[in-house]
């Protein structure tokens, strides 16, 4: 491990042939001989879109690119594809040239002959179209319209820009149509007026007068007896019904008072009478179930806990249990719970008596 100063600088054995490499300090650099790209400075003009387009449009035909590392050095590069707008402009120019050439050729085509030659050709065409077949006689009136038709056709064929001229036949047809339309329309209008005015008036007058009178008479005749009969029926029906209702209303409060008195008497005696057809929920009273209170019974044939303790602690428990088992099938009713209980003061008095007797005997 030594410093950089101790190492001797190695020089290449062969001299460098490239004159660009001799300027570079380090010949081992892979980019030796390629000029460095300039660094952009703040004051330098930046590339705007216009300058970029100009650079794209300017495509050199034979670009001079020299790169010693390139495998295709000395081979000319393929030209870049031109932009779209340039291609469209070229297409438009080519199409315009083609269409202009076609227009010029079509305009000069049909009008090949000019002057007296064109007039002679027109006459020959007219004669060939209007010439009648052999052995037939043709009137002068029939020839004239055919000649006019042929002339108009030739004019249209020779000069396509000329407007169509109305033929006399078309004019005649138009005049006939005008003449036909006017009298027919007038006659139809007059017929309609004649039909509408007298018929409508007569029909309305005839329909309105007798029918309206008959209807009014019928209504007057129908209204009078029907109204009278209805009024009589109402008067007859109202009188008995009103009497019946009054009597019922008088009877109802008496019955209600009697029922109230009877219910009060039943409540006083304590007898609860249930109304038929009415549930307690419909009357608004809750149906509360009253469970019967069960009598508290001891676990073993009515013996109290104190009695159980006394019997268990006594010496002759077995005999008592046996006697209880034997006597259990007898028909005597079991004593109630309260009767079996031995009260505390009675028990103490019995013990005092025994102690007193024991003391007397000892003395």
UniProtKB/Swiss-Prot annotation:
Modified how: Phosphorylated.
Compositional bias ranges of the Polar residues kind: 1-12, 259-285, 311-321
Biased composition, class Basic and acidic residues, residue ranges: 137-152
Region described as Disordered: spans on this chain: 1-81, 126-152, 191-210, 231-363
Ranges annotated as biased composition (Low complexity): 296-308
One of the record's GO cellular component terms: cytosol
Keywords carried by this UniProt record: Cell cycle, Cell division, Cytoplasm, Mitosis, Phosphoprotein, Ubl conjugation, Ubl conjugation pathway
Compartments (UniProt record): Cytoplasm, Cytosol
Compositionally biased intervals (Acidic residues): 192-210
Region (F-box-like): 93-152
Motif mapping: KEN box: 353-355
GO biological process: cell division; protein ubiquitination
InterPro entries: CDCA3
Pathway(s) it belongs to: Protein modification; protein ubiquitination
Superkingdom of the organism of origin: Eukaryota
Quaternary structure and interacting proteins, as annotated: Interacts with wee1, when wee1 is phosphorylated at 'Ser-38'.
Function: F-box-like protein which is required for entry into mitosis. Acts by participating in E3 ligase complexes that mediate the ubiquitination and degradation of WEE1 kinase at G2/M phase.
Comment on protein domains: The KEN box is required for the association with the APC/C-Cdh1 complex.
Name this polypeptide is given: Cell division cycle-associated protein 3
